[in-house]
């Protein structure tokens, strides 16, 4: 796909509500589009942590809209915006590195849960034979495919777009798309767990566990470090309120503990530590924005009563 020019200023973003009224559907996920907006901005920096050259195309395709956050925002809004920009850039780079580490270890099957407008299939240097599955709602994938179809270069792996609602039964859809549960898989749950209830998050991770062969890997974010008062504050700031209203919190307990009880060996690292290592520190006055969790399904180990499907 040809590298589109990034729109300068990047102050416009059409909301999910506007697109939904026009299309008679939910439209493009607001969080997915906001993430693309931030990734496009990061990609313009001389010290960028990654180059998401497709993100500007997604933002441009969204059409005219009010600014997500005005570029000259100051005060608390500006501080929150700075924190979120840094956090999402660091999160993206961290999970880039985790997926590539899995590939280097020999994993050739990758699943991006709630993939949104993720472009890793196109921008990461995947080894030959890599099969990547993007799972998300039909309306989001339809928008994404429309933008991708306008380009000239294909993905750098075998890419499968799987339309499914992760709060419902989705395993059949990914199996029908060619997913092989007997093979080790690198799973990524980026920007999804916190928007699920505890019950929904546990059900999703249970399904992931059931579909994971020994040697599989899982990466996700756990937002237990995000202060509740910060979420409540965001509810009262118009550009951020709709995102805060989507917040459900995810698992009730710590993710590594849950994973350990279900046949995974996991660890977590706080995002501020990662940010410091990447020389993109999150503003000191902000609390820890969240934790990044990585886990591996030990070879020869399965949770009691589990078996590979397919």
Curated annotation (Swiss-Prot):
Keywords: Methyltransferase, S-adenosyl-L-methionine, Transferase. Residues 1-28 are annotated as: Disordered. GO terms for biological process: methylation. Its EC number is 2.1.1.-. It holds the Pfam family LCM. Coiled coil: none annotated. Residues 9-24 have a biased composition (Basic and acidic residues). GO terms for molecular function: methyltransferase activity. It is an enzyme of class 2 (transferase). S-adenosyl-L-methionine binds at residues 136, 165-166. Exhibits S-adenosyl-L-methionine-dependent methyltransferase activity. Belongs to the UPF0677 family. This is Putative S-adenosyl-L-methionine-dependent methyltransferase Franean1_4929. It comes from Parafrankia sp. (strain EAN1pec). The lineage of its organism: Bacteria, Bacillati, Actinomycetota, Actinomycetes, Frankiales.
């Amino acid at each position: 796909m040809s590298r589109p020019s990034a729109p300068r200023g990047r102050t416009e973003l059409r909301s999910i509500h506007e697109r939904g009224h026009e299309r008679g559907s939910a439209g493009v996920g607001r969080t997915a589009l906001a993430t693309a907006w931030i990734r496009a901005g990061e990609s313009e920096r001389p010290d960028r942590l990654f180059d998401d050259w497709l993100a500007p195309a997604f933002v441009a395709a969204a059409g005219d809209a009010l600014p997500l956050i005005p570029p000259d925002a100051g005060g608390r809004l500006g501080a929150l915006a700075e924190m979120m920009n840094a956090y999402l850039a660091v999160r993206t780079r961290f999970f880039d590195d985790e997926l590539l580490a899995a590939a280097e270890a020999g994993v050739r099957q990758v699943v991006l849960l709630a993939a949104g407008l993720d472009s890793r299939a196109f921008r990461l240097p995947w080894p030959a034979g890599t099969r990547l599955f993007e799972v998300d709602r039909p309306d989001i994938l339809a928008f994404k495919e429309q933008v991708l179809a306008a380009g000239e270069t294909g993905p750098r792996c075998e890419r499968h777009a799987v339309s499914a609602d992760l709060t419902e039964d989705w395993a059949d859809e990914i199996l029908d798309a060619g997913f092989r549960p007997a093979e080790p898989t690198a799973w990524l749950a980026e920007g999804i767990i916190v928007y699920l209830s505890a019950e929904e998050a546990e059900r999703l991770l249970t399904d992931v566990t059931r579909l994971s062969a020994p040697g599989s890997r899982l990466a996700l974010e756990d937002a237990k470090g995000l202060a509740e008062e910060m979420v409540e504050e965001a509810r009262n700031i118009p550009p951020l309120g709709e995102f805060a209203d989507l917040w459900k919190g995810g698992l009730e307990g710590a993710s590594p503990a849950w994973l350990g009880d279900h046949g995974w060996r996991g660890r977590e690292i706080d995002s501020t530590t990662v940010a410091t290592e990447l020389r993109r520190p999150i503003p000191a006055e902000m609390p820890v924005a969240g934790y990044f969790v990585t886990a591996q399904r030990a070879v020869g180990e399965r949770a009691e009563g589990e078996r590979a499907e397919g």
